Amino acid sequence: MRFRVSLVSLLILAAYAPEGVKAQSAMPAAAANAERDFDIQAGSLDDALSRFGARAGIMVLADTRLTAGRNSPGVRGRYSVDVALVRLLSGTGLQAYRAADGGYRLRLAPSPDGSGVSELEAVEVLGNDPKPADEVYRTAASVNYLSQDDIERFRGTSVGDIFQGIPGVLVGENRNSGGLDINIRGMQGQGRVPVLVDGARQETTVYRGYSGVASRSYVDPDLIGGIEISKGPVAGALGTGATGGVVAMRTINAKDIIKKEDENWGIRVRGSTSGNSSAAPAAGTAGGMFNAGTYRVNCDPAALCGGQYSMPDTYRNDENFDRPGTLDPYSYASSVAGAWRNEKLELVAAVSKRRQGTYFAGKHGKGAEPVITLTDPPPSIYYDTATVTNGGTTRFYTGERVLNSNNESNSQLLKGKLKLSDAQDIELSYLRYHSEYGELMPSQLMWFNKIYQTQNSEVTAQTATLSHHWQPADQSWLDLRTKVWMTHTDSLNRNYASEDQAEAGAESGVAPEPETYRRIGVELGNTSQFEVWGEHTLSYGATFQHEKISTDPSIGALDDAAGREGNRREYSLYMDWHWQPAPEWQINYGLRYQNSRTRDGKLSTDMRYECGKWAMDAQGVESCQQYVAVPTEMCDGVACSYHYKTRNSGTVPVYSISWEPWLNGLQFYARHAEALRMPSLFESTQGWSVQPAPGVPLRPEHTRNREFGLNLLTNDVLRSNDRLAFKAAYFRNKTNDYLTRTSPNEWENLQQDFVMRNIRSVKLRGFEATLDYDAGRVYTRLSGTRYNFIEVCHEGSYRRDDCNNYGVAASYFNDMIPPKWHASVLLGTRWLDGKLDLGARLTLMGKRNPTPAFNDDTKRAFNWPTLWQDYKVVDIYARYQYSEAVSVDFNIDNLTDRYYVDPLSLGMVPAPGRTARLGLTLNF
C-alpha cells in the first residue's frame, strides 16, 4: 500500500545562517543536512513521526502494518533532518532512506542475519500540509473542519444540517430555500460570515417581509470535498470584512474520486432516498391553524350566531395530515462524479440532483392547539362570546405537513488543473446551481389567517474561478498565488400579496421579486519563508471585489421602488507574519487595510415636511402636501435629490501568541483580532425593508475579538494508538458601530418607517470546548458553547434602557441572537474490522434570551424576536463499507419525533419530524 500526498514544498526549509538568510537549496539533500532543534518525547511511533514532520516541514505517512505497535525513543537536540530521523527510528525496526525524487521512504530494517528487508512495499514519506482534522487542535484560534465523511454522516433534511454540532455555529432560517445563512457567535449576514466556494463569494440578500432580511449562499453538499470554519476575524486573503468568521468550502477534486494512487481515473456514483415528506401541494393550499378570533355562542335567538359570528367547524386542513410511514420514501438525492489525471493534467466533472418534498413536523411537542375561552361576564343577554386562540408554539400542528418546505435543485461542476512545470500549475473551475423552492414568509406565519403554499421561487447561482500557483523549489521567498473569480446569481422570489389571491393560486396572486447579483474578485498573494533568529513565514497580498445589484421591475407586480440598484467596490491589502523563535513558541501578527465605496443607482429624494416648509413638486408647482419629493432639477439650484454614496477605509491588526511548554501536544494561546466590515451593498441602497437616510452616514463596523484558549493533541492516553484531542476557548467579542435597521428617532425629522444606521455596540462573551477521543473500536466527540454575556446597545427614542440582552426595535439583530447555550454529544463504535460504523448524536439547544413582559423595546416594530424553546434531538447513523467500491449509509434523524423550532428562524417554522434515509455510494 502506498500513500502519496501533495506538498506545499517537497523540500525541507533552509538552514539558519548567522550571516543572513539563505534561500532553500535546489538539492533536497543539502536542505536535509541543515541542522535544527528537535524536542520530541518518547512514545508512539505514529505520534513521534507526526511531530517530527511538523517540526521538519514534512508529513510522515506510513502503512499501519509498518508502524502499528511500535514506539519511538524520541529525539532531542540540534540535528540535521537525516540524523534526527535516524535517531527517531532507533530501536523501531524501521529505517528511512532517500529516494531519487528527493522524498523519504520507510522500510523494515534488514535482519541481523542479513536476510534482507521485508517484502512489505516501501512507503513514501513526503512533505504535506498536516491533516485538517488534526490542525484544528494545533491552531492558535477557534477553527473547525468538516470532512466528506462528516458531511455524509449527518446530511439531514436541509443543507444547513451539516453544520449541526459545531460549537458556536448555527444556521439562520435553515428550513427555507436550501440556502445557507451562517451565524458564528452571534455574527450573521451582510458579509459578516462569508461563505466561500473555492475562494469565491456568492452571498445574496433576500426580503423576508416585516421580519427583515436573510443572507443566502447556495451549494450542493455532494459536490463539497471539505469545509474549513474559522471563528472571529481572519488575517489573509479570505478574511476581508469577516467580523464573525469564514466558512471556506472546497469542491471535490480528483483525489476525492480516485481512491488509489496508482490509478488515473475514477467514478463516484452516490444516491440516497428519505421519507417523512410528500409532493408539494398545489399553490394556494392552506395549512396551519386558522380561524382564530372571537365568535358568538349560546345565541337566543339562534340567528344571532350566524354568518361571520358562527363558530367554525374546523381550525385546520385535514389534507395536511396524511403523513407517510417512516420507511416510505419520497425525497431523494443523486450525483455522479468522474475524474481523470496524468502527470500534467487533472479533470473533474460532476452532476447532482436533489428533491426534497414538503416535510412533516414531529408529533411530540407543543404544536398548534385551539384554545377556546368564554367571555366572562357575557357581553349580552342574548349570546355569549368565545375567543379562539393558539395555545401552541407555532401555527403548525404536530405531525402536520409544513407548507413551502419543498426544494428541488440541480448542480453541475467542471474543474481542470494543468501542471505547467514542476513549479507552476493553473486551475479552472465552474459550478452552477439551480433551485426551485417554496418560500415561507414569516408574515404569513404571524399575521395571516391562513398559511398558504406559494408558487415556487427560483434561484440560479454560477461560480467560476481561475487560479495560478507558482512555487520554484529553489526560492523559499516565492510562493505566488493568483486568483480571479466571478459569481452571478439570478433569483426570483414569489410571495403572496393577499389571502384572496393566495387562495386563487394564480400568477396574479404573487408578487415576484427578481434580482440579479454579480460579483467579480481578484486575489494576489505571496508567501516567503526564511530563518533569522528562528523560522519565519510571511504572507502578504491584495484583494479586490466589485459587486453590482440590479432588479427587473417588468416581471410580475413588483413596484420599481422596492427593487435595488447599485454597485460597490472594495480592495484590501494584508500581511500575515508567523514567527517561531523556538520550538515551544509561535507568534503571529497580521495587518489589513481596507477601502470601500458604494453608490446607490436610484435617485434619493429629500422629503419636505408639512405646511410652512413649502417645496416644489415634480412639475415645479409649489405645494403644501405633507410629504413632497423634490427632484434635483426642480429645486431651484438646491441639491434636494442625489445618489446615496458611501466611502470608508481603515486598518486593523490580528495578533496571537502560543506556547507549547513540553512539546507534547499541549498548547496555550492568546489571540487579539480586529476586523472592519464596510457597509454592504444592501445596507447602502434603497429598496424594500429599509434604506439609508439623509443625514445619517454609514460607518464601518469595527469588531474586536479577544480569545484565550488551549489545545491538546496526543496519543496512547488510555490504550495504545488511541487519539485524544481537546480544544477550549474563552472569547470576548465586541462590535462597535454595528450596522442594522432601526426605527427613526424623533429628533431626526426623518419621514421613513425604518432607518439603516450604526448603533453603539453588540457584545457577546462565552466559553467553547470540544473533546474528541478515538480508541478505534469506540469513539466520542463532545462539544458545546455557552454565552455568559449578550448585550446590544443603542441610544434612541422611546428606549427605556440603552442596553439590553434581547434586541432593538426593528433591528435585524433580534433574530441573530444565539441561544445562551448549545451542545452536542456523539458516540460511535466500529465493528467487522472497521467496516461497520454505528453511532448516535444528541443535540441539546437552549432557549433564546426572553423579552421582558413590560417595556419590550422590540414591540415598537413588526419584527418581534422568534422565541424558540429548548429541545433535545437524537440522530442515529450506520455505515457499512462492503468493499473499497461499495458503501451503504442509513440514518434516522430526530429519532424520537420531537416537535421543535430551530434557533434563528425568522418565522416559527417547525423542524422535520422523524426522517429515515438510506444511501448508497459506488466507486469505480
Where are these regions (language model features)?
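C-terminal beta-signal and adjacent terminal beta-strands/loops
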Residues: 205, 676, 734-737, 741, ...
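Short acidic/polar hinge/loop motifs at secondary-structure boundaries
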Residues: 202-231
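Transmembrane beta-barrel wall of Gram-negative outer-membrane proteins
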Residues: 291-436, 532, 592
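Gram-negative outer-membrane beta-barrel transporters
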Residues: 528, 580-587, 594-596, 718, ...
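Short, acidic, small-residue-rich periplasmic hinge/interaction motif at the N-terminus
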Residues: 49-55, 109-152, 190
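Face-selective signature of the C-terminal outer-membrane beta-barrel domain
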Residues: 419-433, 459-630, 658, 662, ...
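Extracytoplasmic beta-strand/coil segments of soluble accessory domains associated
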Residues: 104-107, 160, 164-201, 231-232
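Membrane-embedded beta-barrel scaffold of Gram-negative outer-membrane proteins
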Residues: 469-470, 479-495, 660-662, 667-673, ...
